[in-house]
Amino acid sequence: MADLLDSKTVIACYNTYNPSITLAQTKDDDTFKLYLSDIGLFTTMIFKASPKTDESIYSKLLGDKLSADLGYLYENAVAQMITATGRSAYYHTWEKENSTHYYEVDFLLQDKAKLLPVEVKSSATKKHESIDAFCKKYSQYVSRAILLSQKDVGKDNNLNLKPIYMLPFIMEEL
């Protein structure tokens, strides 16, 4: 793992076991997600099933017309944007009550003395149970919450809906 991180080919996103404004202090070094540092290389790797992968796949991808779950691709792009600003990447996961499932907020950013939870969606933006639960559970630490997707700017109750391409501008405000 250390060799991968030192080579800068991957980005580590650490789980925080007790989210607060001191994310680095509460990170769990044994629980993390890895993203590739080069989104172009990652895109080529996941769509190149054969030496003659059709160019139409890339055209559909760029035109948002590819019928595939691209959540992992968008999450990877967001991780790359976060770390390009010199920040570390963090996320948070916790058990749902009376369930074998977990909640997960894709990214946590420090917003001055508060936290900015960020959820990344590849398609539907109406379902955002995890970020809603996070904002309720950790309301004393949350400044605002953002859901990033391919959709236009909007608002859903207290959740700010933003296109992924706006993340660098959002991060300038932090």
Question: Locations of the language-model features?
Answer:
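Active-site beta-strand-loop-beta-strand hairpin of nuclease catalytic cores
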Residues: 109-117
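Arginine/glycine-rich "motif VI" loop of SF2 helicases in the C-terminal RecA-like domain
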Residues: 134-143
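Accessory nucleic acid-recognition modules appended to NTPase machines
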Residues: 1-104, 109
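C-terminal structured domain segments
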Residues: 132-135, 148
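Short beta-strand-loop-alpha-helix junction that forms the active-site gateway
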Residues: 120-128
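Short, hydrophobic beta-strand segments that form beta-sheet elements in well-ordered domains
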Residues: 143-149
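Residues at alpha-helix caps and immediate loop-helix transition turns in enzyme cores, especially N-
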Residues: 103, 127-131
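Domain-level recognition of nuclease-like catalytic cores that cleave nucleotide substrates
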Residues: 150-174
